[in-house]
Amino acid sequence: MSRSAAASGGPRRPDQHLPPAPCGASGPPETFRTESDGAGTMNKLRQSLRRRKPAYVPEASRPHQWQADEDAVRKGTCSFPVRYLGHVEVEESRGMHVCEDAVKKLKAMGRKSVKSVLWVSADGLRVVDDKTKDLLVDQTIEKVSFCAPDRNLDKAFSYICRDGTTRRWICHCFLALKDSGERLSHAVGCAFAACLERKQRREKECGVTAAFDASRTSFAREGSFRLSGGGRPAEREAGDKKKAEAAAAPAVAPGPAQPGHVSPTPATTSPGEKGEAGTPVAAGTTAAAIPRRHAPLEQLVRQGSFRGFPALSQKNSPFKRQLSLRLNELPSTLQRRTDFQVKGTVPEMEPPGTGDSDGISALCTQISSSFASAGAPVPGPPSATTGTSAWGEPSVPAATAFQPGHKRTPSEAERWLEEVSQVAKAQQQQQQQQQQQQQQQQQQQQQQQQQATSVPPMPTMAPTLQPFSTPVGPFDTAAAQVAVFLPPTHMQPPFVPAYPGLGYPPMPRVPVVGITPSQMVANAFCSAAQLQPQPATLLGKAGAFPPPTAPSAPGGQARPRPNGAPWPPEPAPAPAPELDPFEAQWAALEGKPAVEKPSNPFSGDLQKTFEIEL
């Protein structure tokens, strides 16, 4: 059977596997018919579920939809959702082929487009990022030279503009999301027309005329584009009409009741005038234009233009380098000076003046003690240690006379030098009198020291006096007496006896090893007026040539060393007769300080230790 079927030839049909059809039946079997009917119904159902695309109508055949765009452009509310492809430099300023090539170039770059919104107005074109709301492009309409849709891509639109900084031709390309490129190009054309109308209206209102010559190579312009009245033409027209009505109002309304009737006239007419003349101008003035987006707060802080701390700009800051690099003109220095002048009124009063002088005297004693501890002898402390009252009395008028009479100096050194110069001038006048008194006091001291014996505090000082055994004798009692009076306040006794020049007014003839800067300045001022013999002072630099005073030292502490045993028992009967010469000497010193006490506590008696020749 199979062989006969194979021999019968022909491919096997599907109906061969089916049971034989009844006699007289023709056509395909029933099952085949049902399958074909099911497939047809499914295709019909699938087609019914699909959304059919509307029939395409070209943009040129529906210009009625663009009329709303023109009004929106004039009002500044026209916008289109687009994808910003980017910008590329082009060689020509116009041409559809130039824009098409730019679109192809940007699409070939594969750069990701930015979903944004294109705002079209009479002012210009703005592209705002739809997600971050950043201003991507802000193009003035005057700089746009050409715009056109793409003939190859229905959604593409491009415009060519002049770059403001590099002066190159740049083409910006877009892909519209909902509209066509032709509609975007039409909106930009409306912006061109609105801008041109505004410019012509401005020229007409301002009265600007341009006269060209025959060759068209030059022109002369008359008038100005600047608005003399209000900032806007409509406001200026309304202001002119208000002025005219105000001028005509007094003539129309002579009585008091008339102004109330006339006054509503400008109020009622001006809004109408503004409404009539302002509706078309509103687009020109961009009253409803989109405000430009400002930088975020973080960017303002980063750029340094943040105004959250106004105190930094109000106060004078020393970090404002744009003011001046001179120290006297720095804001910090000026502020310090003004603060001193405000606070300086308190020391100028009489009661605080003494406290100020006491503070200065304490500072001076501290500085002098630091100099002495460092090994630089200070010649002047004994005159200061003769009594706190004697030192404070002359210093009070000096401080009170200095502060109100002068503006505050920038440094203490200038104040110091000024005081030293005053002292030097005073010393030149008082020098002759001091020399006479010094000679008399020298004779008195020599007589008293011959009669007097050593004082109990002296043995403690003896080890420091060994290098100066010969010259220290004449000044032992004086140093001891000072040490007895004021050792705790000024701490002078430990080092006063160690230097021969710390005694009394005969010091200009006695050499001293060290010198303070103030005395160097004082000596430089008064070196020309010094009448003392210079060789003695110049020899005193070495500190090993004090023998000129040795003959005047018959007794004192210089003799315990050579005589040995006989001298130690003598200090016991000495205290009783010691009081009378000491009191006499102290009285002589108290009568003297009014003449020789200067205002500068550092200078002391200002004896000349050596001369500086320049």
Swiss-Prot record:
One of its GO terms (biological process) is cytokine-mediated signaling pathway. Associates with EPS15 and NOTCH1. Interacts (via PTB domain) with MAP3K7IP2 (via C-terminal). Interacts (via C-terminal) with TRAF6 (via TRAF domains). The modification Phosphoserine is found at residues 224, 228, 263, 411. Residues 74-223 form the PID domain. It is found in: Cytoplasm. Keywords: Cytoplasm, Developmental protein, Neurogenesis, Phosphoprotein, Ubl conjugation pathway. SMART domains: PTB. This is Numb-like protein. Residues 563-578 have a biased composition (Pro residues). InterPro entries: Numb/numb-like, Numb_domain, PH-like_dom_sf, PTB/PI_dom. Residues 246-260, 371-390 have a biased composition (Low complexity). The PTB domain is necessary for the inhibition of MAP3K7IP2-mediated activation of NF-kappa-B. One of its GO terms (cellular component) is cytoplasm. Residues 1-68, 223-283, 371-420, 448-468, 539-614 are annotated as: Disordered. Plays a role in the process of neurogenesis. Required throughout embryonic neurogenesis to maintain neural progenitor cells, also called radial glial cells (RGCs), by allowing their daughter cells to choose progenitor over neuronal cell fate. Not required for the proliferation of neural progenitor cells before the onset of embryonic neurogenesis. Also required postnatally in the subventricular zone (SVZ) neurogenesis by regulating SVZ neuroblasts survival and ependymal wall integrity. Negative regulator of NF-kappa-B signaling pathway. Residues 233-245, 409-418 have a biased composition (Basic and acidic residues). PROSITE patterns: PID (PS01179). The modification Phosphothreonine is found at residue 279.
